[in-house]
Amino acid sequence: MTVLTKKDHGWYQGLYEVVNKEKYVGLKKPFYRSSWECRFMSWCDNNPNVIKWSFESIEIPYVITENGFSKSHRYIPDFYVEILNKQNQLKKFLVEIKPYNQGPIKNSKNEVYVPKPPKNKNAKALKIYYLEMKTLKKNTLKWNAARSYCQRNGL
């Protein structure tokens, strides 16, 4: 049984103990960094429709360009999952577990979430805003690379 361990910094992390070992195809032991990841691992492990799953098993290259300089990076999605749907068809997915404010999430009006500039323009508020925008840009580039990867690989 996996036990959520709360760290001093306020989030849960630990090794997930796989119950259905024949379904887990990852090369390394699954390590959750949040309660959301732990719950998703448990869902994959115990859901009879999940045929295979792995944790951080795929690397996708992408490039970030800042100030005219390009730097190569690699994006490692949290999960790879193969599921049998209701029509008994095999569906393959890459899954990333992220909070709402860290990704290009669309609301019900199909608008992409963008952090609002701070009302108070002090140094701390501006720094937080800058970091949120930088994270959103980086995650958008990663996920665009992931979409291309999925299209090329039939996911």
Tell what function each PLM region has.
Residues 1-155:
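Electrostatic, structured charged patches in enzyme active sites and in nucleic-acid/phosphate-binding
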